[in-house]
């Protein structure tokens, strides 16, 4: 029995399902989840000392690669001064200044401890600002596990085939309108009918929780116009895309400015963190300036701020995101060539250093329905074949993959060699 098998068996005694986040359980791909003990650069090392090229990257934060020495040094320096104060620090002021400089739509920002907190708080703020109750989200998009957002959500809920979670009261769900992603006409029609009741539209500008679905041309622009017309707050959930698809996030990449944005992952350099912010007139409604309450014991945690500040400064160097995107493109082109040679229906998507893999003969991946044409059983086999070849992909057919600046020629060679064998075995 492997160490991972032993640990997973032991974990199930006191941890529900043996994991602390559902997708880690390998339920959607089968087999025993890997337990990792070390990560460095583009690699993770499991408890049985097998090394893998990592395309999960802790689900996005590790854009520099794992254990970047400058980030570790920043955390060590802060450790000498304490773990948490529950009081303001200079680091959180530096972080706020840096985020607002990098993302022009951010006039004010509030730090929290997770992406779920960020989206939950942004929606509460939008409701408080507008005095309206309803929100619009999109089919297949995931914005964390708060009650009002677990309605036809993607990601873990999609993987398990549960459209909404037990424990979410119908009274919460009724205020959440779920529309098709990339369908701007559905948005216009809905707002024409109930726009005066809608506080906000929240959207992943690149839907990273039904694998990786970029916005259709005109979709984000259409959302901006529709929100302006009906006095609706536009929220971009950039927990995944923020600082990854471009330094200024997807809003800079696609040239569309939201009213509020949410961030996580990269902003903490691998530490637990989240943030939300945007227009000053909206953010001034947050306590203690305004009546909308939001608080957190660990918000602005100095360790997370130290790691995040160092990460953001390192990714600010000229050419960083071009290099990240170029590697991702080379890798996806190599996968496509090998799938085509093996006669395997296969489609890839990309937004900077973020990508999606679909076993489908669909011409393009644009909608939730396109995503659902993907052959999940074939992905399961591909996942394990790649794992055997030393490549760790997201253990779900509905999760985005991520590259880091630490991925280079050697990692590309390992990945494509493993893929060539995997596609051949899938015939």
Curated annotation (Swiss-Prot):
One Pfam family, short name: Aminotran_3
Protein name: Glutamate-1-semialdehyde 2,1-aminomutase
N6-(pyridoxal phosphate)lysine modified-residue sites: 265
Cofactor(s), names only, from the UniProt record: pyridoxal 5'-phosphate
Primary subcellular site in the record, as a coarse category: cytoplasm
UniProt similarity note: Belongs to the class-III pyridoxal-phosphate-dependent aminotransferase family. HemL subfamily.
Catalytic activity: (S)-4-amino-5-oxopentanoate = 5-aminolevulinate
Gene: hemL
Pathway: Porphyrin-containing compound metabolism; protoporphyrin-IX biosynthesis; 5-aminolevulinate from L-glutamyl-tRNA(Glu): step 2/2
One GO CC term, this protein: cytoplasm
Classification via InterPro entries: 4pyrrol_synth_GluAld_NH2Trfase (IPR004639), Aminotrans_3 (IPR005814), Aminotrans_3_PPA_site (IPR049704), PyrdxlP-dep_Trfase (IPR015424), PyrdxlP-dep_Trfase_major (IPR015421), PyrdxlP-dep_Trfase_small (IPR015422)
Keyword line: Cytoplasm, Isomerase, Porphyrin biosynthesis, Pyridoxal phosphate
GO biological process, one term: protoporphyrinogen IX biosynthetic process
């Amino acid at each position: 029995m492997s160490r991972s098998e032993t640990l997973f068996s032991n974990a199930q005694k006191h941890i529900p399902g043996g994991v602390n986040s559902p997708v880690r359980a390998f339920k959607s791909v089968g087999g025993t989840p890997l337990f990792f003990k070390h990560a460095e650069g583009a690699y993770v090392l499991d408890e049985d000392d097998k090394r893998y090229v990592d395309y999960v990257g802790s689900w996005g934060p590790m854009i520099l690669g794992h254990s970047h020495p400058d980030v570790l040094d920043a955390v060590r320096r802060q450790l000498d001064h304490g773990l948490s104060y529950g009081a303001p620090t200079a680091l959180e002021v530096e972080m706020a200044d840096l985020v607002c400089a990098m993302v022009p739509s951010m006039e004010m920002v509030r730090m929290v401890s997770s992406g779920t907190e960020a989206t939950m708080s942004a929606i509460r703020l939008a409701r408080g600002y507008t005095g309206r109750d309803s929100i619009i989200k999109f089919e297949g998009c995931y914005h964390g596990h708060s009650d009002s957002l677990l309605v036809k959500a993607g990601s873990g809920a999609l993987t398990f085939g549960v459209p909404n979670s037990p424990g979410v009261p119908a009274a919460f769900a009724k205020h959440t309108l779920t529309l098709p992603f990339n369908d701007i006409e559905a948005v216009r029609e809905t707002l024409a009918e109930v726009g005066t009741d809608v506080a906000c539209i929240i959207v992943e500008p690149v839907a990273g929780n039904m694998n990786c679905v970029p916005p259709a041309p005109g979709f984000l622009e259409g959302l901006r116009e529709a929100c302006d017309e009906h006095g609706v707050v536009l929220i971009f959930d950039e927990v995944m895309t923020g600082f990854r698809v471009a330094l200024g996030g997807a809003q800079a990449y696609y040239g569309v400015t939201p009213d509020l944005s949410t961030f996580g992952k990269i902003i903490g350099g691998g530490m637990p963190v989240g943030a939300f912010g945007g227009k000053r007139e909206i953010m001034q409604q947050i306590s203690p300036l305004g009546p909308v309450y939001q608080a957190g014991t660990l918000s602005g945690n100095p360790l997370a701020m130290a790691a995040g500040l160092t990460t953001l400064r390192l990714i600010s160097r000229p050419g960083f995101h071009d290099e990240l995107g170029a590697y991702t493109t080379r890798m996806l082109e190599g996968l496509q060539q090998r799938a085509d040679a093996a006669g395997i229906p296969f489609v890839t998507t990309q937004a900077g250093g973020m990508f999606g893999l679909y076993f489908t003969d669909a011409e393009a991946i644009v909608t939730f329905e396109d995503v659902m044409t993907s052959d999940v059983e074939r992905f399961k086999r591909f996942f394990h074949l790649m794992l055997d070849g030393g490549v760790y992909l997201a253990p779900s057919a509905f999760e985005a993959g991520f590259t880091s600046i630490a991925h280079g020629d050697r990692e590309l060679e390992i990945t494509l060699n493993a893929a060539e064998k995997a596609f051949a075995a899938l015939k």
